Swiss-Prot record:
Mg(2+) binds at D77, D79, D81. GO terms for cellular component: cytoplasm. It comes from Pseudomonas savastanoi pv. phaseolicola (strain 1448A / Race 6) (Pseudomonas syringae pv. phaseolicola (strain 1448A / Race 6)). GO terms for molecular function: magnesium ion binding; phosphoribosyl-AMP cyclohydrolase activity; zinc ion binding. Zn(2+) binds at C78, C95, C102. This is Phosphoribosyl-AMP cyclohydrolase.
Length: 130
């Protein structure tokens, strides 16, 4: 029997894009990367765990901020090369800027306009010692 992780088309770096969506509203919260271990741990721990390309290590969402993403459902797209995580975003903040979503800018009049408010100052989030 084929391992469920073997069905994924990992890129040349062994990663797959992972999109986190709010399980109730469907709003896209963020996009990050997962390697095989991150996806396996996400499924077993029922929380979002990503691969940090900049730090070169696993990143348990919320480990510093307390803004954990509880997993409700995992989905794989038709080409088996993108994952969607349907999550409950603890604290209502997914973005390191203190916003609900990382997608807080809208293209308008040949430029990017910030449309979502900062819900909590990032300095307060990351200095709280979570």
């Amino acid at each position: 029997m084929k391992d469920w992780l073997d069905e994924i088309h990992w890129n040349s770096d062994g990663l797959v894009p992972a999109i986190a969506q709010d399980h109730k509203t469907g709003r896209v919260l963020m996009m990050a990367w997962m390697n095989r271990e991150a996806l396996s741990l996400t499924a077993s721990e029922n929380r979002a765990i990503y691969w940090s390309r900049s730090r070169g290590k696993l990143w348990r969402k919320g480990e510093e901020s307390g803004h954990v993403q509880k997993l409700h459902e995992l989905r794989l797209d038709c080409d088996a090369d993108v994952i969607i995580l349907m999550v409950e975003q603890i604290g209502g903040i997914a973005c390191h800027t203190g916003r609900e979503s990382c997608f807080y800018r809208v293209y308008e009049n040949s430029g990017w306009k910030t449309v979502d408010p900062v819900l909590k100052d990032p300095d307060a989030i990351y200095s709280a010692g979570h």
